[in-house]
Amino acid sequence: MKHSQTKPRLLIAMRSELPEGFFGSREWARLNAITDIIPGFPHMDFDTAEGAEALAEADILLAAWGTPSLTRERLSRAPRLKMLAYAASSVRMVAPAEFWETSDILVTTAASAMAVPVAEFTYAAIIMCGKDVFRLRDEHRAERGTGVFGSRRGKSLAHLGNHARKVGIVGASRIGRLVMEMLARGKFEIAVYDPFLSAEEAASLGARKTELDELLAWSDVVSLHAPILPETHHMIGARELALMADHAIFINTARGWLVDHEALLAEALSGRLRILIDTPEPEPLPTESPFYDLPNVVLTPHIAGALGNELRALSDLAITEIERFVAGLAPLHPVHKQDMERMA
């Protein structure tokens, strides 16, 4: 965007609780230095009189969770809009298929910033689940000091621990690649399944490329990082889970879309696998779901992604993209129509 005496007008549209987490004094100062923020933010409805007026005035849209979808009709009411800066990961909800058919608006994403906490959470989950920390904590709490600590280190627990463990990564996404980089620094063997990844690329990440069935049968730990695509729906079902070894660990910090949860529940009820689910299907699970109570299941409420002060990493990147746009510089992380075929 070329410099002018008039600052571009910025529309902030996201869930009402998010600005407090996204923006501190530093972030507001950066935005005010380069844009004219449209009052009344955060706007959550582009179809009210106030929301429609704000959309019509906007040159830049700073979006996140809860931003209304930019349908063809809404785009027709946004004649000035030149940039969508998304301060989260997947832009699919804000930029649906019709957006790409009718718009040449620049789209940027903070997916690379979001990938960091998810990868950190996943790596920590691999370590913690490897030592069965959550189940042993529950047993220790119930025993209240009456248990025998020596029994925790006996031969019967050979499946516990992280020495030379074999970890299978399903999906060489941003997050999957970061997890592999973290694992490669330790004493892990790594395999990866991704039809878009070459064997050479896998090797550069410290992993070997395999087919899905081989990965499932080989791995002590399986971690999902594939995108939501028609062909990935329930890619992990009863047949695939049956390939996994007894005591293997199954981790999903991606999306419930990838897993047949009826099949996963059957395996969970058998006690054969150790399971961590951050993103179930449906989300949230119904109150009566057995997943909540099974000792071999760790269920977390979609917290692998940016949480608390981690939101500032997302807004920092989104604001950086806006600063670059206003200065006429190329974006760091643009999203194009063809990217949507493989992105989460």
Residues covered by each model-derived region:
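An N-terminal-biased, well-structured beta-alpha scaffold segment characteristic
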Residues: 2-108, 237
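Glycine-rich adenosine-cofactor-binding loop
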Residues: 111, 160-184
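A short helix->loop->beta-strand "cap" motif at the edges of active sites that frequently abuts
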Residues: 78-83, 102-105, 188, 246-248, ...
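Oxidoreductase and adenylate-handling cofactor-binding alpha/beta cores
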Residues: 119-138, 184-188, 317-324, 329
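Rossmann-like adenosine-cofactor binding region
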Residues: 69-71, 191, 195-290
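Phosphate-coordination loops involved in phosphoryl transfer and adenosine-cofactor binding
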Residues: 7, 163-166, 247
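Phosphate-binding beta-alpha-beta segment of Rossmann-like dinucleotide-binding domains, i.e.
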Residues: 105, 110-166
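Rossmann-like dinucleotide-binding domain for NAD(H)/NADP(H)
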Residues: 107, 247-344
